[in-house]
Structure formats: structure tokens, C-alpha cells
């Protein structure tokens, strides 16, 4: 954080990485082929979402299921959370089994293009939709930030299918193209699309895309994990700097550590006592 006075002579200089000891480094997304990233970004721009099938193996899905299922307990406090929907918050404080979802290279490669450097993890939850759950109220994830539309997205979300997503078991319902809307809200005439995908697949969508959890009219649960991300100058939904111990922060990947808030948005956003927060982990 300590920069030579002569290196900062314009306001533009303040928007650069001023850290000396903890310089910004590329994310794991840099390993993804550029053509693949460009195709993903074109789909995001057109539709507001992209589906990647079979990123996780059946064994990886079963491992996640085995770890998180014992923690499933109470259902939602209101109809938005879901009266028949179980949620596990602060997953990172409990297990490392979902880390590979948070920092998957395909995800980071898109976020590197969509958001500013040192973007943050906003939430990581396991969500289990039980039989009999009704459809969730349509919403867009960055609508909780009071900045009028139309605008560029302030956030993005991934939803990972740990169980198969079907049109009947609570698959997330998207409104393609709604990320470009202005102030208007969905109407019954708008086209909606359930994200039908096999277990191990992931849908990523921008924070301005209208969507909601689908109704589960089957006799089986539908388990998913969602990781959400936001611009580095916004307040995340989950206060990870409070819920994640420094011991855990030391043990996760560099990318996850950065997304937990052990990073700086230039020039000083996120500093601790005027210094880079990574010093707390030394």
C-alpha cells in the first residue's frame, strides 16, 4: 500500500495497483483458452447466462452431497427463502469440499472479464428445495444495491447442480434477455426458461438477469450450491471477514483468499490500519 509519492501524480494513478509487497496477480481464470472465454462472454451478453454441463464428476457431486446433507435443517423464514427450502450459509467456514466450485477456472475466466480486479465472493450457500416448494418470486441478484437500471451488472452468480435439475424439481427459472431491461419487472407474457441440466453442471448469470427458484412438484429433493460474486467496491451479502477465521483464510487458495476480502480495490478500499489485509495472515 505504501507507494512512493512521486508515483502518484494524477487521479488516474490512484486507480492502479499501489501495493508494493502484495501486488495483484492473475487469477486461475487465465488458464482458460481465450476462444472459450470469448464464446462464454458472447452468450452472457446476448442471453444473460451460460450453462456449462458436466464440470463436476458424479463422485465429486456425491462427496458434496455426503458432506452438506447432515447440515440441512430448518427451512426458510419467509416465502422468498422458501418455506420448503433448506439453506446452509457460511459454507466456507464448515468445509473445503465446495472450494473447487468457488474458484473454478471457467468461472474466474468470466468474472475476470465481467467485474473489476479483486472482485469479491458475495455468498456461498447450499440450497435444497424440498418436494412441495412453490416457485420463488422473480428477482435479480444485484437489485439489492439501489442503483437504477438499465446499467452494467454489479454482480454475477453461479448455481451448481448437485442433483439433476429438471423442469419439475425446482430448477432455477431464468428470463433470457431480461438483463437488458430497464425499470420494468417480469410479466406473465415474458418468456421464462427452467435451467434443465445434469448433476455436475453449472449455470452462470449476470446480476441483472431476472430469475427465481422453480417449484418442486416431484417427490425428491433438489440440492444445489450457489456461489455469488460482486464488484470489489460493494458490500457482499455474507460478511466473510467476520465468519471465516484467519486460520481458514490461510488454508484456502489464493483466489478464494482474495475474494474473501484479503485484497485491495485501488487505492485503499479494504485496507486494515492503512495496510494491505494480507499482512494479517503473515
Task: Kindly give the residue locations of the regions a language model identified.
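A structural signal for short, well-ordered beta-strand segments
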Residues: 123-126, 158-160, 225-229
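Catalytic palm active-site di-aspartate
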Residues: 48-49, 200
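Catalytic core of non-heme Fe(II) oxygenases with the double-stranded beta-helix
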Residues: 133-197, 234-244
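Non-heme Fe(II)-dependent double-stranded beta-helix
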Residues: 2-47, 53-148
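A short, structural micro-pattern
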Residues: 120, 152-154, 219-221
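Conserved double-stranded beta-helix
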Residues: 2-3, 181-204, 208-209, 214-282
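A conserved hydrophobic position in a structured secondary element of the catalytic/binding core
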Residues: 93, 102-103, 175, 205, ...
Amino acid at each position: 500500500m505504501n507507494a512512493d509519492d512521486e508515483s502518484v501524480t494524477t487521479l488516474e494513478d490512484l486507480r492502479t495497483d499501489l501495493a508494493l509487497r502484495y501486488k495483484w496477480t492473475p487469477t486461475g481464470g487465465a488458464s482458460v483458452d481465450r476462444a472459450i472465454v470469448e464464446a462464454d462472454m458472447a452468450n452472457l451478453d446476448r442471453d444473460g447466462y451460460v450453462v456449462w454441463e458436466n464440470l463436476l464428476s458424479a463422485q465429486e457431486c456425491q462427496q458434496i452431497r455426503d458432506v452438506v446433507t447432515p447440515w440441512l435443517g430448518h427451512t426458510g423464514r419467509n416465502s422468498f427463502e422458501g418455506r420448503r427450502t433448506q439453506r446452509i450459509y457460511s459454507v466456507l467456514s464448515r468445509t473445503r469440499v465446495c472450494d473447487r466450485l468457488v474458484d473454478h477456472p471457467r468461472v474466474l475466466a468470466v468474472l475476470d472479464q465481467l467485474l473489476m480486479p479483486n472482485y469479491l465472493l458475495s455468498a456461498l450457500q447450499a440450497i435444497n428445495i424440498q418436494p412441495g416448494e412453490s416457485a420463488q418470486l422473480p428477482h435479480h441478484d444485484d437489485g439489492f444495491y439501489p442503483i437504477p437500471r438499465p446499467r452494467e451488472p454489479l454482480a454475477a452468480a453461479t448455481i451448481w447442480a448437485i442433483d439433476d435439475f429438471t423442469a419439475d424439481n425446482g430448477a432455477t427459472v431464468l428470463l433470457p434477455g431480461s438483463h437488458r431491461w430497464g425499470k420494468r419487472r417480469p410479466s406473465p407474457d415474458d418468456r421464462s426458461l427452467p435451467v434443465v441440466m445434469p448433476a455436475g453442471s453449472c449455470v452462470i448469470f449476470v446480476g441483472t438477469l431476472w430469475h427465481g427458484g422453480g417449484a418442486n412438484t416431484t417427490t425428491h429433493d433438489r440440492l444445489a450450491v450457489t456461489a455469488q460474486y460482486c464488484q470489489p467496491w460493494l458490500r457482499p451479502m455474507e460478511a466473510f471477514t467476520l465468519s471465516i477465521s484467519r486460520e481458514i483464510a490461510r488454508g484456502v487458495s489464493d483466489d478464494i483468499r482474495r475474494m474473501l476480502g484479503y485484497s485491495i480495490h485501488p487505492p485503499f478500499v479494504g485496507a486494515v490500519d492503512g495496510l494491505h489485509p494480507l499482512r494479517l495472515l503473515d
